[in-house]
């Protein structure tokens, strides 16, 4: 390059300046080619001051340099350019080859893309990942494991489409060719069948293991097992869809197991309830007993003692602890406002067996009845929802689940019915029997609200079939006790004033009237069953109250004949009952939002004012209104006389 610069008479400074100019002045507006020519323009050396010899010498040197350039530099430059041309030609050939290959690859890519557009869906449809296969075979069965069931079910549907397309020999068009299965499709089908069988076998073993756990000697809460099964509830529909007979066998095995489970569980629970201590309500708790002439504080000739063997046997001691009965206990028994809590309390928690076995509190029979039947209802509810959610079959209906529940709980129902029979058979607690009837009514409506099948309602109807006849027997007993009551004119004793010598039977109520008033108010309170209207006249309670009322009026008529003014005596006693009924009626209107929760004490000073609001009266039971009107009519009749 130095020789070339010398031949072209290029100054180094000029050359450097040219490089700097081309590098830095990129925004220069002049033509770069013109600038180059201007900078590289050959300038002949000035010969003004040179001698001819010097000029000759200079020309010789120039000639020598030119010859050297021609003989040495130019050939090398020619060789370099020739080699460069050859290399450029080779590069051009390589580029042509690359271009040709690129076109070939582009064509191949387009071809493969066209093919993959048809093959990729098939691969995605038929592919089963190895990780999924490993999880199906070895993975823990839990909520995430159920995704394998969904995957296999989807694959089975896709495989069935390919099978149907293969069977269709006329399907030759290109549009449906993508749905034609590959040659090794049969092997894929075999793999799918194997995986289905693995899922079926593992699911079956899981369900059987849970059923065996319920049958173990160590007590295991059934709801814990049910919750574990509900977390993997997709396994049973898969069994049902692929092996219906196996699904039915598993469900039947579960039903047999739960039948045994509930029978054992409730047998132990009933034994615990049997240990409960109950109040002694015997034949001494009768109308006419506990009065001045029929005191039970000592041995006497009370008329009610005549019926002490009316419905009793020695077996009654198995349920009731015999304790001395006092007049105060009899008087307290006829007031049941505290016992109404069992019908109005919002907390419906069942008494656990440990508490029942260690409870030293005296209980009434409705406590045992409600706890047992409420426990059965709660378990029926849980079992119903589990059968519906886990063991659902195609086309399952309400009647089939009802049949399964009845199969599971029938032994339990039989034991509960036997317990109820033992509970009331030797007991004279007429209020306890009636409260138990109201508890059964409430449980019937609660089961309907929960959507429980009719089997539980049928069970409660069976309980009511036992309770109502026993109630009628006790009504007969009370009516007979009323008819045997002593015919006297003794007035009632009041707290703080035990002397009755200054009280006249014409101005103060008879002691039997006060006792009957408490009894009647308690009975009428229990006439309120539930919010849904029913035909009250169809209930035995309606006619029973009328029977008791008629027998009481017969006794009062006999007692009035021993007074100077029978009409005034009857008017005084009926007025007392009428005022009691007015108080009850008034409080039913005040507490209309919760018609079964009353506070009788706060109404002691209420006069003869009657609530005449028709809207409020509609919430008061018919028997209360009729009884109130009946005594009102009697008061008016005897007052006019």
Curated annotation (Swiss-Prot):
One of its GO terms (molecular function) is syntaxin binding. It holds the Pfam family Vps52_C. The modification Phosphoserine is found at residue 602. It is found in: Golgi apparatus, trans-Golgi network membrane; Endosome membrane; Cytoplasm, Cytoskeleton. Keywords: Coiled coil, Cytoplasm, Cytoskeleton, Endosome, Golgi apparatus, Membrane, Phosphoprotein, Protein transport, Transport. GO terms for biological process: actin filament-based process; endocytic recycling; Golgi to vacuole transport; intracellular sphingolipid homeostasis; positive regulation of macroautophagy; protein targeting to vacuole; retrograde transport, endosome to Golgi. Residues 81-110 form a coiled coil. It is a peripheral membrane protein. GO terms for cellular component: cytoskeleton; cytosol; endosome membrane; GARP complex; Golgi apparatus. Its main location: Golgi. Involved in retrograde transport from early and late endosomes to late Golgi by linking the vesicle through the t-SNARE TGL1 to the Golgi, leading to the membrane fusion between late Golgi and endosomal vesicles. May also be involved in the actin cytoskeleton organization. Component of the Golgi-associated retrograde protein (GARP) complex, also called VFT (VPS fifty-three) complex, composed of VPS51, VPS52, VPS53 and VPS54. Also interacts with TLG1 and YPT6. Present with 3130 molecules/cell in log phase SD medium. Belongs to the VPS52 family. This is Vacuolar protein sorting-associated protein 52. The lineage of its organism: Eukaryota, Fungi, Dikarya, Ascomycota, Saccharomycotina.
């Amino acid at each position: 390059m130095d020789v070339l610069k010398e031949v072209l008479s290029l100054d180094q400074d000029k050359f450097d300046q040219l490089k700097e100019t081309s590098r830095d002045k990129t925004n220069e507006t002049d033509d770069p080619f013109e600038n180059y020519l201007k900078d590289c323009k050959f300038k002949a050396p000035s010969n003004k001051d040179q001698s001819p010899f010097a000029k000759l010498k200079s020309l010789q040197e120039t000639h020598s340099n030119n010859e050297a350039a021609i003989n040495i530099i130019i050939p090398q430059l020619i060789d370099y350019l020739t080699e460069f041309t050859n290399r450029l030609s080779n590069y051009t050939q390589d580029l042509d080859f690359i271009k040709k290959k690129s076109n070939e690859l582009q064509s191949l890519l387009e071809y493969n893309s066209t093919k993959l557009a048809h093959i990729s869906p098939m691969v995605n449809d038929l592919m089963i990942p190895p990780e999924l296969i490993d999880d199906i075979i070895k993975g823990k069965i839990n909520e995430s494991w159920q995704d394998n069931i969904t995957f296999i079910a989807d694959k089975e549907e896709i495989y069935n489409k390919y099978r149907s397309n293969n069977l269709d020999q006329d399907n030759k068009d290109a549009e449906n060719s993508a749905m034609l299965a590959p040659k090794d499709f049969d092997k894929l089908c075999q793999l799918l069948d194997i995986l289905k069988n693995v899922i079926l076998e593992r699911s079956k073993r899981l369900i059987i293991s849970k059923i065996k756990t319920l049958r173990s000697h160590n007590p295991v809460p059934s709801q814990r097992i049910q919750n574990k099964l509900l977390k993997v509830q997709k396994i049973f529909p898969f069994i049902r869809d692929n092996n219906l007979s196996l699904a039915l066998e598993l469900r039947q095995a579960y039903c047999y197991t739960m039948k045994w489970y509930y029978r054992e569980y409730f047998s132990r629970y009933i034994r615990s309830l049997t240990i409960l201590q109950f109040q002694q309500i015997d034949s001494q708790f009768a109308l006419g007993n506990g009065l001045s002439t029929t005191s039970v504080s000592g041995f006497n000739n009370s008329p009610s003692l005549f019926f002490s063997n009316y419905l009793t046997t020695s077996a009654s001691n198995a349920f009731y602890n015999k304790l001395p009965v006092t007049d105060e206990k009899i008087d307290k028994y006829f007031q049941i406002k505290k016992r109404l809590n069992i019908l109005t309390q919002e907390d419906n928690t069942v008494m656990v067996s440990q508490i029942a076995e260690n409870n030293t509190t005296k209980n009434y029979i409705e406590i045992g009845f409600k706890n047992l039947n409420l426990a059965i209802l709660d378990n029926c509810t849980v079992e119903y929802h589990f059968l519906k959610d886990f063991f659902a079959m195609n086309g399952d209906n309400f009647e089939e689940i009802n049949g399964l529940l009845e199969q599971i709980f029938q032994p339990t129902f039989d034991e509960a019915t036997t317990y109820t029979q033992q509970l009331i058979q030797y007991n004279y607690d007429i209020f306890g029997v009636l409260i138990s009837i109201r508890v059964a009514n409430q449980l019937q409506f609660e089961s309907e609200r929960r959507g429980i099948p009719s089997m539980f309602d049928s069970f409660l109807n069976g309980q009511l079939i036992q309770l109502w006849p026993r109630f009628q027997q006790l009504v007969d007993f009370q009516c007979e006790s009323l008819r045997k009551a002593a015919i006297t004119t003794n007035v009632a004793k009041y707290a703080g004033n035990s002397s009755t010598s200054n009280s006249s039977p014409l101005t103060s109520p008879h002691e039997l009237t006060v006792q009957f008033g408490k009894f009647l108010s308690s009975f009428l309170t229990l006439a309120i069953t539930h919010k849904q209207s029913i035909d009250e006249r169809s209930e035995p309670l309606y006619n029973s109250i009328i029977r008791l009322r008629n027998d009481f009026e017969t006794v009062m008529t006999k007692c009035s004949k021993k007074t100077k003014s029978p009409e005034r005596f009857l008017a005084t006693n009926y007025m007392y009952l009428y005022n009691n009924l007015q108080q009850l009626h008034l409080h039913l209107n005040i507490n209309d939002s919760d018609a079964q929760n009353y506070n009788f004490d706060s109404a002691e000073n209420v006069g003869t004012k009657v609530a005449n609001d028709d809207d409020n009266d509609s919430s008061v039971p018919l028997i209360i209104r009729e009884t109130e009107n009946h005594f009102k009519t009697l008061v008016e009749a005897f007052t006019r006389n």
